[in-house]
Amino acid sequence: MPPAGTASSSIVRLVAALSRQFLALGCRRVRVLGSDAFVRLLTDPQRAAEGRGIVSLANHISVLDEPLMWGTLPRSLFQQERTVRWSLGASDIIFKNELCRWFFHRGQTWEVFRGQGIYQPAINHAITRLGAGSWVHIFPEGRVNLSRSTRLRRFKWGVSRLILEAPTTPYVV
């Protein structure tokens, strides 16, 4: 399980700040629809007290999609552990060496192994975090999808396991 603490908080804040700068300097305009409702849900103290987590799902076309999403969120969300996302990352893509492993573990990312099924420690950790009211973000297609169509590939079984086995049914965004 990725360690929490000062190093983890520092890495998450650093990536969020760099992503925000990249979006500000590298994009003419960034528009996020529905972010106010998402932030309200994420910061709702009653939701967290009830142990009702959030599963957010997104398609992605590059490995930059996940960290760049952080740059669109308010800075205040990165001050508390309960409002910072946990994520799953493919072993063969982002955990290629010890430095990457150290960095991504401290960036609140669990290592999943393609082809090894839905009963992996990373999925177990995600279910536990959902039961504690945490936010878990996943890319349910299980790979980068370079298709120009808006059609999603099939979701993986792990998505169902997260939702069905969480102690309290999580919000799904």
Enumerate the predicted regions with their spans:
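Soluble catalytic domains of membrane acyltransferases
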Residues: 29-173
